[in-house]
Structure formats: C-alpha cells, structure tokens
C-alpha cells in the first residue's frame, strides 16, 4: 500500500500522486511500488527496500543527497485477556529523506504513522523535511 500526503492550508491531506514536498507512506509495498517511488523521488531503490527485512538493525546511511534512517518501532504482538497486559515486539521502519520528499517504509501499518496521517499531530509540514522527521521520531 502506498499513500501520499501533503500539508495543504496547514492540514495534512491525502493526495493522489507524488509531488514536491509530500510524504510517501509505504506499508508492505510490492516490488513495483518500490521501483515507482524510488524513481519518482530519485532515491536508491535499496534505501526504500531496506526496512522490509524484519531483521534489519537500526542505522543511518547517506548517499549523495539522500538519507536513510532505520529505526525499530514497537508493535503489539498479542494482548492477554487474563491480566490485561500486552506483549510488544519491534519491527524496522525506514525513513528516507530525499531532495523533494520524505518516504516512510514499514512491513506493517503503524499507529505512529497512522496518527500523523489522520491529523492527530499538530503543526505537521511535510515540506519541512527535517522537522517532519523529528515529529515522526518524537512519536516513537
């Protein structure tokens, strides 16, 4: 699944296609989707593919004018009805900062990114790439 978002009139809004200053949220993307987004954003396909390895460790990598950050994010593995507790695990999430966009890639839909996409986080400006990345990281 690939979704495109952009800040329009101070609100995060879903758009239909890639554009300058947008946020691309990819959840369990296909090979074709990875290739299309890598081409549109002019980033290395390996950067957008890196977070799809469940064993990928956290790291930061740079290549030309692009930055890849892999961070582990918590996911609820299962809930225990008996004691009301939850079991958590982590999965990698990739954040690619390109010249014209921020791309997030994850194997599963994350409440962290979903809350941003649904407008629960105030002051989000997708065109301000560094600030937007910090807003994502602060939600983790």
Residue map of PLM features:
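Peripheral, non-transmembrane regulatory/ligand-interaction domains of membrane transport proteins
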Residues: 1-140
């Amino acid at each position: 699944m690939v979704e495109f978002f952009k800040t329009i009139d101070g609100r995060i809004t879903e758009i239909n296609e890639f554009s300058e200053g947008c946020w691309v949220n990819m959840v369990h993307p296909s090979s074709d989707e990875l290739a299309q987004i890598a081409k549109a954003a002019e980033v290395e396909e390996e950067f957008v593919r890196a977070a799809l390895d469940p064993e990928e460790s956290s790291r930061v990598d740079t290549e030309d004018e692009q930055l890849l950050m892999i961070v582990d994010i918590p996911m609820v593995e299962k809930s225990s009805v008996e004691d009301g507790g939850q079991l958590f695990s982590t999965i990698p999430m990739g954040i690619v900062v390109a010249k014209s966009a921020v791309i997030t890639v994850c194997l599963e839909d994350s409440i962290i990114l979903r809350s941003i996409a649904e407008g629960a986080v105030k002051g989000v400006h997708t065109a301000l790439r560094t600030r937007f990345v910090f807003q994502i990281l602060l939600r983790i």
